[in-house]
């Protein structure tokens, strides 16, 4: 390395490489890079082995430590210093990455160099000897330390990335990445021109959320977009409902919103290209970013105050970044540029307002065509509802409350019915998908009280070229509510608007045709529509009759969406669904999540007319439909907010679901990249379900069918219908056994439950693998010892009565088990043993975001303190304790106001991150050093990695709650039945992840 003549400053580029340790593969990778550099018109100067001290590493980091080398590249004489040279290096790096997947290019630039690894920040300087050299100076330093709670740690996924460090999570990353893939087809840059083909895929499909955002920002920068502008359009501030924002700035954000959806989620992002350094905060401000400016022109920004020791008398300014705001330092000009001045320089670049006025089309402004809406007779509508699998409960308990009250029906208790894949019923495909949600690593959002940052707008039509600013880019249709009335759909279908070309594509097929063939025909029809100039396709299942059945709407939408992604057309063609199938909030959420831009639920809306005709709904039809649509929209926003997502534009196509009980072949083919750990139904099974419902509506023998809707027993037990774990017989047997103290009767109850478990849950499919020889009974742990580990579920005072709450505590104390207060606090008089000698004090005291009833006495009386991060029945949201139930004695215990309703727990920003949880654990341990600290999580994909972070944060107990947990109040269908995963999956994942990380014995 000492013999390499690298030339003057910025006349050379430095690459930092993680290479394989195998000598042969190392030589091959190095040679490959040298050839590519020369082929791209540059001169390779030589290699340098980076001096390191591996002894400072931990065991796991040392085991997978790569070979770390630096490569030097000379700038060609005909290339300008700075960005132009970095662009050449970027192209060379992308070509190398595509030809060598075993190596990782940490950085390759003439302006920046990245040192990183799988270790703590305190080990950075000790590991890299370069950083101990006092002559090593830089005007800019970005340093990042993280818990690594949403990805498994590795050398490659450590921060910093090439242009950013990111504290937070991009919750919409699946949709963002898919859309960037599709944009490759229509993005053109004067700076990259024919080189563009070498740069795809722009986004690394195997990268983390931060890595893929870094890929996108780097590509935009290399395509000619200034880095601050790229940050503004990927992480925009909340502008749509901000009346205090200038018209020019709102026009700017509106223009770019037509081409780039927000990369949504909690984020404090620092960025640099070597000349400028900046920081931006997400639209909700869900990550702290504080900074000092000193009298010697230093800017120190960090998530915490006090990360560096220095004389505070030199501080001339203390400030923090505000939600959506940006700060920039230009080291070339020696300027600190604040948010307003920085953004002003971009929002006035073009006449965005004029462009929008001339091109952006609003749904409300489209003319209503002189075309009649297709209507159905009473009998026809019943027949179609049977064909689409409607049940009596869905209409009465879901559609009716939404049309009547404008909000989703509230339910209580938990779920004791089978998973869709285990049910004997023919469930709609929607029921096989479970909603994911935020816990610990980022907070859910209160969509009602944070309305200013929430946007429901969706854009329909072909997307413009984000790399070129021009008026026609924003020639799209803007829809404020993606749930369309029949009139809305007619306006779109017959729109006489330039650049909005609409084509109907049927999703019905002749009964008897294999479903996979019908989907292939659908692909051909969509491709033909696009070839003929359509940039909006309406997938419609109107046309179901005795000979034609409909492809399940979710399957049709997702299949077409992924087909368009694969053929790089998804930003050129928008999908609108006209379907009789969706009727519940969860149905619409999955359709949006898998690619639909808007949905017209024509049959659900017609069922409202039937409710009015039957006298069950006394309301104007159009008002009722409007309330139903708004209720659905509100429900979707709430589902998105549980994941920390503020905009439906970002939620659309983000696939934030886990499939339970669908075969891998179906997932890979039609729901690509969906998390799925339990296989099940095939494409033939799905077709069988479709045919079953169709045959109930259309009898091929010509017999008269019963067209009344079946009561399936989803919410209440119905004999001969859906199985329930707790049915009248099991409940009666348990109650009688308890009342009569009859152990034999109790054994009958447990036998019934174990027998009933089989068709209901995953654990019912398992059996014990008994050894050939058992253990003598005298060697088995005693009953008295076993029951000490019994704990009741957390049920708050207020959700259940005082008598029930106290009885549970007394019973558990008598057997030396532990009862749990729930989040509602506990009466002071219960903290001491009463004169009757009964101990009513719950051993486990729960602490949730509302801190209801949490006092010093409450905490010191605990044997275990449980931090409630989420609840199985309603993860990411709180139940509603109505004002009428907040009695004076409830309010006293909770330290709230009588007669004022409570959201329990409130989704405010109590825990922003794993660091916040670590702080709370520390504080609670100081309040009661004898109590064990427990953290309650809910089962979902990735909970094991979160649990590993929780263990690192100091928790001694981790509770995994399942989707079937109980609640006092939550949306019946969207939350109780469709959020969260079985605890069996979460428990297994958590156990395995803790073992893998050496944390299980802690």
Give the positions of each predicted feature:
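Flexible, glycine-rich loop/tail regions that form catalytic "lids" or insertion modules at the edges
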Residues: 220-267, 271-275, 303-307, 340-516, ...
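Glycine-rich phosphate/ribose-binding loops and adjacent secondary-structure elements
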Residues: 95-100, 104-106, 121-128, 143-197, ...
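Mobile "lid/hinge" segments at catalytic clefts and subdomain interfaces of large enzymes
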Residues: 177-210, 295-306, 312-330, 595, ...
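Active-site beta->alpha loop and helix N-cap motifs at the rims of alpha/beta catalytic domains
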Residues: 902-908
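Hydrophobic/aromatic-rich, well-ordered segments within soluble, folded domains that form packed cores
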Residues: 170-173, 321, 326-332, 804-817, ...
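Conserved short alpha-helical segments that host acidic/polar catalytic motifs at enzyme active sites
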Residues: 1-464, 470
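Acidic low-complexity segments
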Residues: 502-505, 897, 903
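Short, flexible, solvent-exposed loop/turn segments with mixed acidic/basic and small polar residues
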Residues: 2-9, 783-786, 923
């Amino acid at each position: 390395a000492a013999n390499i003549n690298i030339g003057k400053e910025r006349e050379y580029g430095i690459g930092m490489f993680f290479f394989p340790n195998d000598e042969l593969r190392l030589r091959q990778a190095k040679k490959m890079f040298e050839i590519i550099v020369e082929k791209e018109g540059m001169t390779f100067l030589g290699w340098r082995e980076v001096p390191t001290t591996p002894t400072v590493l931990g065991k796991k980091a040392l085991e997978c430590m790569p070979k770390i080398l630096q490569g030097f590249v000379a700038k060609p004489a005909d290339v300008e210093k700075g960005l132009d040279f970095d662009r050449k290096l970027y192209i060379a790096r992308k070509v190398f990455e595509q030809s060598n997947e075993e190596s990782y290019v940490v950085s390759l630039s003439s302006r920046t160099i990245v040192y990183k690894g799988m270790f703590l920040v305190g080990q950075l300087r000790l590991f890299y000897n370069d950083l101990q050299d006092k002559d090593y100076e830089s005007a800019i330093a970005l340093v990042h330390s993280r818990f690594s709670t949403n990805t498994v740690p590795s050398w490659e996924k450590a921060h910093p990335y090439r242009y950013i460090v990111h504290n937070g999570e991009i919750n919409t990353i699946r949709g963002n990445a898919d859309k960037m893939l599709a944009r490759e087809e229509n993005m053109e840059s004067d700076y990259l021109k024919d080189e563009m083909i070498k740069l795809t895929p722009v986004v690394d499909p195997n990268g983390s959320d931060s890595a893929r955002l870094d890929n996108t920002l780097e590509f935009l920068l290399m395509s000619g977009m200034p880095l601050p502008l790229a940050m503004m359009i990927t992480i925009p501030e909340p502008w749509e409902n901000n009346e205090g924002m200038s018209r020019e700035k709102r026009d700017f954000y509106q223009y770019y919103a037509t081409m780039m959806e927000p990369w949504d989620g909690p984020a404090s992002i620092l960025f640099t290209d070597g000349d400028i350094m900046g920081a931006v905060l997400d639209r909700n401000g869900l990550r702290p970013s504080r900074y000092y400016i000193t009298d010697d022109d230093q800017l120190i920004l960090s998530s915490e105050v006090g990360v560096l020791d220095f004389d505070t008398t030199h501080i001339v300014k203390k400030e923090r970044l505000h939600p959506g705001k940006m700060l920039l330092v230009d080291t070339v000009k020696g300027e600190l540029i604040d948010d307003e001045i920085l953004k002003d320089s971009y929002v006035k670049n073009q006449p965005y307002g004029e462009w929008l006025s001339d091109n952006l089309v609003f749904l409300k402004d489209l003319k209503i065509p002189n075309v009649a809406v297709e209507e159905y007779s009473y009998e026809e509508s019943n027949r179609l509802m049977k064909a689409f699998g409607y049940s009596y409960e869905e209409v009465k308990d879901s559609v009716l409350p939404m049309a009547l009250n404008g909000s989703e029906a509230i339910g209580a208790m938990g779920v004791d019915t089978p998973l869709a894949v285990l049910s004997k019923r023919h469930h709609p495909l929607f029921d096989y998908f479970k909603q994911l949600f935020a816990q610990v690593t980022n907070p859910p959002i209160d969509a009602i009280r944070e309305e200013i940052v929430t946007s429901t707008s969706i854009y329909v039509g072909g997307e413009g070229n984000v790399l070129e600013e021009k008026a026609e880019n924003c020639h799209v249709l803007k829809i404020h509510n993606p749930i369309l009335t029949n009139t809305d759909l007619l306006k779109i279908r017959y729109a006489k608007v330039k650049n909005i070309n609409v084509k109907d594509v049927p999703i019905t097929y002749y009964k008897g045709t294999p479903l996979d063939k019908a989907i292939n025909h659908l692909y051909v029809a969509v491709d033909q529509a696009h070839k003929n100039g359509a940039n909006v396709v309406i997938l419609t299942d109107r046309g179901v009759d005795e000979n034609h059945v409909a492809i399940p709407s979710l399957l049709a939408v997702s299949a077409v969406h992924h087909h368009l992604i694969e053929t790089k057309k998804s930003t050129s063609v928008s999908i609108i669904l006209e379907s009789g199938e969706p009727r519940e909030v969860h149905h619409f959420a999955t359709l949006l999540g898998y690619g639909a831009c808007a949905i017209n639920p024509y049959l659900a809306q017609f069922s409202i007319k039937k409710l009015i005709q039957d006298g069950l709904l006394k309301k104007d039809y159009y008002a009722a439909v409007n309330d139903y649509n708004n209720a659905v929209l509100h429900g979707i926003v709430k589902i998105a907010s549980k994941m920390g997502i503020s905009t439906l534009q970002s939620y659309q196509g983000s696939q934030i679901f886990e499939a339970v009980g669908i075969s891998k072949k179906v997932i890979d083919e039609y729901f690509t990249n969906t998390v799925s750990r339990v296989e099940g139904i095939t494409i033939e099974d799905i077709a069988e379900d479709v045919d079953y419902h169709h045959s109930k509506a259309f009898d091929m023998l010509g017999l008269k069918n019963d067209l009344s809707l079946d009561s399936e027993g989803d919410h209440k037990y119905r004999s001969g219908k859906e199985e329930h774990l707790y049915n009248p017989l099991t409940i009666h047997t348990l109650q009688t056994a308890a009342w009569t103290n009859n152990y034999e009767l109790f054994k009958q109850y447990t036998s019934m439950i174990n027998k009933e478990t089989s068709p209901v849950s995953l654990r019912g499919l398992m059996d014990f693998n008994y050894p050939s020889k058992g253990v003598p009974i005298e060697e088995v742990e005693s009953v008295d010892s076993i029951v000490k580990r019994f704990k009741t579920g957390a049920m708050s005072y207020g959700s259940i009565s005082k008598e029930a709450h106290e009885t549970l505590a007394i019973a558990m104390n008598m057997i030396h088990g532990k009862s749990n207060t729930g989040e509602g606090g506990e009466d002071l008089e219960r903290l001491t043993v009463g004169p009757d000698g009964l101990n009513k004090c719950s051993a486990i005291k729960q602490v949730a975001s509302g801190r209801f009833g949490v006092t010093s006495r409450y905490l010191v009386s605990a044997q275990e303190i449980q931090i409630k991060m989420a609840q199985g029945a309603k993860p990411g949201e709180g139940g509603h304790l109505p004002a009428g139930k907040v009695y004076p004695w409830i309010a006293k215990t909770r330290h709230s106001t009588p007669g004022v309703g409570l959201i329990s727990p409130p989704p405010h920003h109590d825990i922003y991150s794993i660091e916040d949880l670590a702080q709370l654990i520390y504080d609670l341990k100081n309040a009661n050093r004898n109590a064990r600290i427990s953290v309650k999580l809910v089962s979902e994909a990735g909970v094991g990695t979160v649990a590993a972070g929780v263990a690192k944060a100091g928790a001694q107990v981790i509770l995994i709650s399942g989707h079937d947990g109980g609640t006092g109040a939550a949306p019946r269908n969207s939350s109780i039945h469709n959020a969260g995963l079985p605890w069996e999956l979460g428990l297994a994942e958590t156990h395995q992840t803790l073992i893998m990380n050496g944390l299980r014995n802690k």
